[in-house]
């Protein structure tokens, strides 16, 4: 059934987005992607390559933070980037640093955060704000990332819940590991990250949080400030933001922007 569903989704991407001439003159498009849109991008990339004739050269890292593979560090070293995929606030910061074309930012999907616990562990109730507060207070350890979701956790969520003093001493920022993997191997009892980043990780259960305290962000795309293939990059961005790509994006836990 999963293979059939995937074939049906790809069948929905049948309409061409580039001309035969463009396919014949394929180029390399360098893409930097943060975790929020990575699963969707990896599913859509082969179809774009097939239809366009271009080849995608991809690298991945966190939207923020000091890790060597984080997007700000990669761009600061001068790594090539025709297209950058990340949360919109990260793209704005990168544009402010001169790494991106600020006027090219294109929203692709809404993304939300969630907690995860190891498969087989007790699944705490987070159906209400009070229940979530109690679950975080009871958790022996909590993992979060240095990227956008982690910044939300340490600067907004626990502050709004009024439990920062109690939970931050038992919370740890992990990098470069994916938070779902940290939880799956038992290094933390609970972890917070974008839903789209948690869903591909085996060995965990995802727990959604109340919308009242949810962090709704935009997974977006932008042209690199020194893009070597700007026209091909725009073709990729048009493909990722097209209605035809929406079903595959939704299948990764994101809410596509409807156009």
Predicted regions, residues:
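Short beta-strand
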Residues: 106
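N-terminal export signals
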Residues: 2-24
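Phosphate-/polyanion-interacting regions in eukaryotic proteins
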Residues: 85
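Exported/periplasmic ABC-transporter solute-binding proteins
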Residues: 25-69, 76-80, 89, 93-96, ...
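A short, gly/pro- and small-residue-rich
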Residues: 98-103
